[in-house]
């Protein structure tokens, strides 16, 4: 845990591998036994993340076929560590020869060198987005646990590319709408404009950033552990650990700072099935604990750092120079970031679901009686 390659408390994932190494993968420890699981379950998510899926993503061609090496027997999980492997097949280390001695601006090259005194400069090594294969594979397992155990649905989509913003209702958006176009934006008009923007940036050897929005529906009440493991804090850490992420907000986010308390508060009301809130500016979390409403969050992603435009930089021996990077890179990370965000949200919710049941649901203790307190005057 101290080296930053593992994530989670009870549902713990450890990813490994580099961009141009032999393979990448993940070990998942803490998955409950008897979960139906196949390579097809995982492959469906990896196919959404893989490179080369459209003309607005990196042209690197990787099938990203997964192998389950342990932890599953006759189609069911054993409760033991699950090892998932994906072999790299289309590595071109020669495209990165300049990076052996030259730092890419705004990439991890310089900081990895400063920290470790050595780095794998082929495609970014551990800092490459190929590391997220392990996250998405583990997220596929977490998604299945959440769906079967609690009916939780997690859906992300591209909400903005540069200045093109989609008009989307998180409460009603569907997976079919998201997957209807290559940019994964459920607003068709905005999607067309986004694609044009990305195509133009790619022609110029440049890149664009934007925002991915994610909604988690049917999340049980009670997930989250005050005070340092609040649900939104763990969600923020999870998505902010993704490559190129630069910002996080949940519910009303920064826009909520323009409101008064009266305007911002989510008032309660009763339904036959229990209490609900009339609005959802809290984004489904209050006091660090899920309240049963949709969890709605947004993640900002910067423009891809590796571009073909000439940029000023320095070398390992301290010489100033100019670099126009080669290699194959996404002109915009947003379309492929969608399954990555879903995976990280799933990992957090699955971990907290297991933690909640371990602390609050595992023992048959008596309910605390409701005190007889007079209602306040309206």
From Swiss-Prot:
InterPro entries in UniProt: Chorismate_synth, Chorismate_synth_AroC_sf, Chorismate_synthase_CS
Xref: Gene3D superfamilies: Chorismate synthase AroC
Catalyzed chemical reaction(s): 5-O-(1-carboxyvinyl)-3-phosphoshikimate = chorismate + phosphate
Cross-referenced CDD domains: Chorismate_synthase (cd07304)
Cofactor: FMNH2
Note on how the cofactor is bound: Reduced FMN (FMNH(2)).
Residues the record lists as binding NADP(+): 49
Binding positions (FMN): 126-128, 287, 302-306, 328
EC number(s) from the headed UniProt entry: 4.2.3.5
Lineage: superkingdom: Bacteria
Gene Ontology, cellular component aspect: cytosol
Pathway the protein acts in: Metabolic intermediate biosynthesis; chorismate biosynthesis; chorismate from D-erythrose 4-phosphate and phosphoenolpyruvate: step 7/7
Keywords: Amino-acid biosynthesis, Aromatic amino acid biosynthesis, FAD, Flavoprotein, FMN, Lyase, NADP
GO biological process per UniProt: amino acid biosynthetic process; aromatic amino acid family biosynthetic process; chorismate biosynthetic process
Classification via HAMAP family: Chorismate_synth (MF_00300)
Chain's role: This reaction introduces a second double bond into the aromatic ring system.
NCBIfam families in UniProt: aroC, PRK05382.1
Similarity section: Belongs to the chorismate synthase family.
Subunit architecture: Homotetramer.
Protein name: Chorismate synthase
Organism (species): Synechococcus sp. (strain JA-3-3Ab) (Cyanobacteria bacterium Yellowstone A-Prime)
Gene responsible for this protein: aroC
